[in-house]
Amino acid sequence: MCGILAIIGKGKEEALVQQLSKRMSHRGPDESDIHVTEKGHILAHERLSIVDLHTGKQPIQGTDSAWMVHNGEIYNHKKLRETTLKHHTFRTTSDSEVIVHLYEEFGYDFCDMLDGIFALVVIDGDDYIVARDPLGVKPLYYGMDERGRLYFASEMKAITDQCKSFSTFPPGHYYTEKTGFVKYYKPEWEAHEKAVEKLDLKALNASLTQAVEKRLMCDVPFGVLLSGGLDSSLIASITSRLLEGSGQELHSFSIGLDASAPDLVAAKKVADFIGTTHHEIHFTVEQGIEILDKLIWHLETYDVTSIRASTPMYFLSKAITEKGIKMVLSGEGADEIFGGYLYFRNAPSVLDFQKETIERVQKLFTADLLRADKSTMAHGLEARVPFLD
C-alpha cells in the first residue's frame, strides 16, 4: 500500500509536488520518489513496501514511454507475467509492474484483468488512464485547478488547496481524456433478480479460503485482526490453517478499554482455540479524546460514526506496526454481504433483504472501507479484506 499523486498538465513546480506528496508520507514511510514526464506531467509516490522490497520503487517505467504509479496489491501478477505478458521484459518483480505492461498490450481495456485492489495512474505521452478497484478498497480522489490541470491522489489533503473543485473517484471505473468515466466492473450480483443460486456451504468455504490464501502474498511479517466476532474469527481460523506446517507464527490483535471488554474476552477464546500468538491492546477514553484532531486529519471526515469506529483501529494499528508488522487481514464486508447487522432481521421481504445487501456492498467505499484504509494507513499498516474478493 502506498500514497499516489498524479498531475496531468504542464507547469507545476516539482518541488511543490514533492511537498504535496509528502502530506501522505504516513501511507508510504519506506520510500518517496517523483517523475516528470517528457510532456511535463508528474507522478509522485510514497511507498509502503510489501512485495518486492528491493526493486519495487515507483513510479515504474514500462517498455518505452509509459510510466505508472499504483496503490494496492495485484494478487494475480505472477500468473499475468507467465501467461498474458510472457513476451514482455520486466524491470522488477513488483506486482505493480504488470499494470503498465497490460496498458502497453491492451490500451485502456485491462482493468478487469486485474485481481486485486488498486488506485492507479498510467501516463504515456499526453495519453493517460486512471482507475480504481471494483469496490473502492483503495481510496482515490480527483480535482481540477484554475488552469485546467487534473489532479489524482490517494488522500484529499494532497490536492485540496491546489484545486478549485475535487471529488471522489468512483469505484469500478476508469477515466481517460478520450472516454471520460467508464464503468468496467459489471458483476452479476448487482442485479437482484439474478440471485437464484442455492446455498452451497462447501463452495462458500472454498471461495473464502482461496480469498484468504491469495492475500497472504507478501514479503513482510503479517497478522490478523481479531474482534471475536464471526467474520474476523473465520478469517483468523482459515489463515491459521493455511499456515500449518510452515513454521510461521501467526499474530492476532484485538483492542478494548480493558481486559474485561466483551470483544477482548471473545477474541482471547478464539486465539487460544486456533493457536495464534495473541496481543491485547488497551486504550482509555482520555487517550481517544486526545487524538481526535489527528484522527480527523487522517480520516478526512467529521462523520461521527466513522470517527467513533476508527478510534480503536487507530490505536491498534500503531501498536501493530510497532511490533514490525506491515500487513493484516481484516473482516470488513461480511456483515454487508450476509446481512449481519441487526436491522436486517426487519426486512419486509426476501427481495428487500437482497436489495439492501447489494446497496450496502456498493456503498462500502463511503464508510467502512474508508475507515479501514485511513485508520490503518495512518501508521503505514496495510489491511486486506478477503470477504470482498
Spans of model-derived segments:
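Short aromatic-hydrophobic micro-motifs that form the base-stacking/packing surface
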Residues: 68, 329-330
